[in-house]
Amino acid sequence: MCGIVGAIAQRDVAEILLEGLRRLEYRGYDSAGLAVVDAEGHMTRLRRLGKVQMLAQAAEEHPLHGGTGIAHTRWATHGEPSEVNAHPHVSEHIVVVHNGIIENHEPLREELKARGYTFVSETDTEVIAHLVNWELKQGGTLREAVLRAIPQLRGAYGTVIMDSRHPDTLLAARSGSPLVIGLGMGENFIASDQLALLPVTRRFIFLEEGDIAEITRRSVNIFDKTGAEVKRQDIESNLQYDAGDKGIYRHYMQKEIYEQPNAIKNTLTGRISHGQVDLSELGPNADELLSKVEHIQILACGTSYNSGMVSRYWFESLAGIPCDVEIASEFRYRKSAVRRNSLMITLSQSGETADTLAGLRLSKELGYLGSLAICNVPGSSLVRESDLALMTNAGTEIGVASTKAFTTQLTVLLMLVAKLSRLKGLDASIEHDIVHGLQALPSRIEQMLSQDKRIEALAEDFSDKHHALFLGRGDQYPIALEGALKLKEISYIHAEAYAAGELKHGPLALIDADMPVIVVAPNNELLEKLKSNIEEVRARGGQLYVFADQDAGFVSSDNMHIIEMPHVEEVIAPIFYTVPLQLLAYHVALIKGTDVDQPRNLAKSVTVE
């Protein structure tokens, strides 16, 4: 969601801040701003509604000089998107940027008004600026003021604070929203995502929950909320910002759809050996833990939740392990009964999804056997806090609507299923079929991508529609969910997905000539049942678009469009059938002229509740 970048150096830092913000644009935002302080304490602040490029243009018109600065991209939570609500916020000489939500901002606002403070924005962040200012007036250093102010905040925050009168220091505090310090030579940096700092450093310290950091050019000191100094290990990162430019593609999403064959190859690299899945990266004790697993609980949000839903079918049918999948925001606020020897699996592209992280932390209190994170970002909070972790190795995903992160999550999950089936002593043919299918998957997707022009032609039929219905059965039902999510995310068409067997239990009432119905139809044991559901739609005049196996025996008619798909191995069919639905959503959005890579109101990494 929001992005933070801070720098303290002997050189001008404005361009470092702007480049950091550019690297965080993919997370989603509606406004941007920065503040820079020079050695004499002169502070310059610029804020703009819209893209970082508009802020950069303003910085060219009003050159910013100074070695200390903080910058921010805002995704509105409290207060509409506007320049006055954009960060940084100030209270006299105190300057603040903040990610998260301060839940008790209203009573704090009233207290501060009673003390004479005037609020100029609608944001909860301005409360932090005035509160630190008030505490500083009570005496002591900026660090002491921050240590007194922070315990008064309830909610999630990652915040960076500077005092323009003392430009030699930055203060940062983290609770529920990530912050990482970048270590340089005679200069230091801070950001909400290490990607922002890769041009200036490879050495990082990840702040932990409750940490408060004091950063100067030559030192970093970290304290807990009591003011006691704590030690945090610095690491050398090999993370690559490999998004590059869009090349021949119009959008990052299109590029990332086409990158999926190579992304899946990268996910598989080093993990298949002698016809078996090799997950030795999990460490020497992983087999002992995994062999005890009698139940799997999966937590995720959004697209990751849909991948978890697919894997439930795999864990149960192929590994014989009962599996439950739950939306993380629901799990964390209900009283749940923990099954015996239950493994907690969390799924997140970013590894910073607030609800998923909170669910992981809750699982440790509830007594789960262990935790395993499946993630695309090494060093993320989810990875650091889990017992075991598997990286998807999808490469940087810029488009807000997930594509290659989803299919590589499924690839990792299927490898884990193979591993567990072997540990459970099941028939070796299960793992053999999974490995064979996964090795064939990249070429199968390349075949499918050759159908792009056919799908593009169909997209015209959707451009004037307001609703769409997706249907699937078995492990294709979650793929229908994912297809509906993609269409609504980027084309703004209201789309719903149902298990096809539920058609008569409500959704059939929606069917008419203006309701496109998209069906995924691999040639499996559920095909005949699915054909009956399709006939129910045809009989009521619905417009059908069926992505069907070439051997499934479908014939196009006036109200049924058949898009033939190459035959694929059954075990990989859910991954394969995801791709045409991604392309359909992309082309519909293109016709409608929406912002494909950064759809309205959405963020790539949801770091608040």
Swiss-Prot record:
Single GO cellular component term = cytosol
- EC class, as a word, reads transferase
The EC number(s) given in the record are: 2.6.1.16
Q: Where in the cell is it found?
A: Cytoplasm
Q: Catalyses which reaction?
A: D-fructose 6-phosphate + L-glutamine = D-glucosamine 6-phosphate + L-glutamate
Q: What transmembrane ranges does the database entry give?
A: none
Keywords from the UniProt entry: Aminotransferase, Cytoplasm, Glutamine amidotransferase, Repeat, Transferase
> Residues in domain SIS?
286-426, 458-599
**Domain Glutamine amidotransferase type-2 positions:** 2-218
Catalytic residues of the enzyme: C2 (nucleophile), K604 (for fru-6p isomerization activity)
Principal cellular location given in the protein's record: cytoplasm
Job of this protein: Catalyzes the first step in hexosamine metabolism, converting fructose-6P into glucosamine-6P using glutamine as a nitrogen source.
Could you give the subunit structure recorded for this chain? Answer: Homodimer. In pull-down experiments interacts with CedA.
Name of the molecule in the record: Glutamine--fructose-6-phosphate aminotransferase [isomerizing]
Q: Which organism is it from?
A: Escherichia coli (strain K12)
